[in-house]
Amino acid sequence: DAPLVATQPEFSVNCLTPLRDGTFDQCLSTGMVPLAWSPLSGGKLATGDGIRPELIELLDELSVRESVDRATIAIAFILANPAEPIPIVGTQQTSRLRELAKATGVNLTREDVYNLIEASDGVSLP
């Protein structure tokens, strides 16, 4: 039998399910690679449509601090996860891909990540 080497959960700062349902725990324990689909929530994280205002505000604050756009911060959030998810972006525009690639140079602190999770959930972490 061939081992499973990848999984493709929906994961974004707006969809945190893999943090809570054991998906990323399994990836860490088995070496399986998570391929995060819809990392920008179908473009909603870029536009702000239908996203908690607190989350958009924090993404915007971090984007100013890091000199990138909101979507790039959202990708940086994914890259900050210890399970090392690979975001699957839906654009084919070279300029957009270049902008999102800047996420590899964004330095989100643990506090930034926790604050993003809290803003996404609308509740404080313990």
Q: Model-found features: residue ranges?
A:
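Beta/alpha (TIM)-barrel catalytic core signal, keyed to glycine-rich beta->alpha loops juxtaposed to Asp/Glu
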Residues: 1-125
